[in-house]
Amino acid sequence: MRRFSRRRASQMLLGLIALLLASTLVFLYLKSSRDQTATYTQSRDLIRQLQQLNAQWDSEVLKARIAITHNYDPLVTPLSDMTRIWSELQDRDTYHNPADLPGWQASQAAYVAAIQEKARLVDQFKSHNAVLRNSLAFLPTAEDDIQAQFNQIDDQGRLQLQGVATDTYDLLLSSLEFAQVTSDERAADILVGLGKLAINKESLPSEFQAPVDILSNHISLILREQPLVNSLLERIAAVPVAERLDDLTTHLNQDQQNADLVDHQYHRYLLIFSTLLVVLLLYLAVRLLRSFAEINRVNRALQSANETLEQRVERRTQQLKDAQSELLDSARQAGMAEIATNVLHNVGNVLNSVNISAELVSRKLRGSKALGLGKAMQLINAHQGDLGTFLTDDEKGKLLPGYLNQLVEAIAVEQQGMSDELAQLSKSIDHIKDIVSTQQSYAGAATLLEPINIGALMDDALRMNAGALSRHHVTVVKEYAQVPQILGDKHRLLLIMVNLISNAKYAMSNLSERPRQITLKVEAQGEDTLKISVKDDGEGIPPENMTRIFTHGFTTRKEGHGFGLHSCALAAVQMHGQLSAHSDGPGLGAVFTLTIPLTLAGSSS
Amino acid sequence: MSNVSTTRFSLVLALCLCTGAALAAAPLDEALKALPSVPLQDPAKVELGRRLFNEPRLSANNSLSCASCHHLETGGADNKPFSLGLDGKPVPLNTPTVFNASLNFKQFWDGRVDTLQAQIEHALIGPVEMASDWKAVEYNLSAHPDYQRAFAQVYADGVSAANVQDALASYERTLLTPNSRFDQYLLGNTEILTIKEKYGYQRFKEYGCIACHQGVNIGGNMLQKFGVMGDYFKARGNPVESDLGRYLLTGDEEDRHVFKVPSLRNVAVTAPYFHDASAKTLEDAVDVMFKYQLGRTPSQEDKELIIQFLRTLTGEWAGKPL
């Protein structure tokens, strides 16, 4: 018991260890199996795309700056692409080092701030650059418009206004130069030129007013916008979007290195735990093998034990069989003894009458009148010579003939009596011979099937019990149906019947208030069964004994040995029949019924 | 065998088409770009967006839908200077067209949001517009088994604010007006424009309109100060808060009177013009632009040419010219 519980405990411990190792392995596997390299590569790829787009954006800004194109869509699309890629990047759970997470987030925030600032500046740049480019492009046309006005004036007037025209042209040139090289000096020059133009405008004819206004407006715009655009460009260039992206890449690289380190650690752990698990498995395998061996050993032991057991069972079965046959023999012997007792009892009864007859004969012989004959002969022999005289003269002689006549009569009577007595004797001896020969015809006969007249067999059985029956004043009622001669075991049948009749007689031994009666019944049941029943009016069988009455050793009698019904039942079974009992209860009598196969004597040879 | 021949046939066909196209209509490389085709989207989503677009349950008192102000039959806006909000009072800004709005780089006159989704939210929640809130909208739509089914069909999580926005945005992306004559011209069919319209385009470029109105949406890709060459608002008089434009959003002096440059697509059918609806006709609008944005005085002829050109920008909706 204790060993069992210890085994259980160790099994549970093993299971727990295995579970622990397995879950640790799974944990480590999950920890180390994330495809971090791919994630980092993808993230870095996204950042690289962002950098490319940023560079593209910068180049588009420059293109717009030098007015290669009027289309501002290319200044919009990089930003929307970057926004898309950025959200894609953020959707990725790329970062792993929780310690550095705030740094990573700060870098992200810095990038977002930078890109927002850059977007704001680019939008401003677009607005200012658009109007600046327009004015710069328009400037020559505006100047042309003024020159056209000049050209319309006659030579006299043109000479007067030559200075103004030159000033205007100079102003145009310095404005265009200003667009290329923006400096405060030039700005001052242009301001002076604009002032001059304003003064000149006063002296110009009215048709000049509008073109000059337009020109000066546009020049002022250039003067205003050009530094703005320039500074915007500088500020755009100064927005550290690329640097922030580099920061992010650096961060990612560091994080990857850290993650790789952690990964390596986990790999090592994984290795260690795998080894542990393998060791455990090996240990378990060894244990398994050992337990297999143990099982085999136990199996073999069990097998041999089984074999021994079988032998023992066989032996015991044999013993039982022997005991049974011994029992049968003893039962048979007991039956035979019972028969013999009956027979001897009967023989004894008859011997009694033989004895009486013999006594009578011998007494008659002892007192026989034949002795008187001898005395008469002595008288005759003494008177040989004078026999005649003697017979006639002598007193005694004269009486002799009468005496002899009387003697003859007496001897005749005597002979008659003895002859009767001897006839009685020989009858008694015949009876004994009968009883003995009946006994001899049953005893010792094995299961020999022979034609039986059931009625005669029943009568034999009764005869064997005849003394006891008559001594107990039992009336026998015979209800024999017409049954043909059957083929059966005479000895066993007789054994059963003698026993049943004897039992019936015993059952009624305490009966005093009513006549004792045994009813014997023979009848055929169907075509193949013969039913013989012995019914008594005796003490009956209580229901609790009903199941036990056929068992060996069961008896209700003091001197009984419990063999009788048991051997009868056995004999019935041996005849392929059955012996059954029925009782309505204590005091109500019992019926024992033997059913045997009805095999007609003529049917088999 | 049949596979091979099919492949070969389609190859030949493709070659023919290519050469044919190259001969007939090489797209022009201009600063103005042709309208792109409608992006591929889930038709169920678009249909759901269409229903939502016409759904008054989106507004606080179930009286206004998107379509109340954005009439698709008439240019994608209403013809009022200011649409009437939920309270029946006019909103402060002229309703921009919903057509081709997906091509704008930002939404609203002041460019206050970058995405259609955000635009939808602003319009839905804006107290002077639909004055609703997402909870009410979700509740109203969920109460309707049809909507529940339609949403469940397209979105795993059924009715939600994000899904309403997504469906509406999907629908709005389909609201493009293709096939304008100018688009056909850009795609290479140079015969489609009259000589005057071509001149008009030429003037449009020469005068510098193109400086701001360019790209795929002919505008809608930058912000610009209203009154570059002069104080428009002083001249117009009666200044109101909404004239401040982006300044209201950023508080940056740089952004005073700055608005998103509107698209010129379908400009001929989206009068009145400007954020304040001050220009009733295209002529008025062009005049203002010349004076305050370009600082130039065009000849009457040039102006008319430009207006003729602007009329070629009207596209089609549902197969019919707007």
Predicted features and spans:
Chain B
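Periplasmic c-type cytochrome electron-transfer domains
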Residues: 5-6, 23-322
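Bacterial N-terminal signal peptides
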Residues: 10-20
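Bacterial N-terminal signal peptides that target proteins for export
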Residues: 2-12
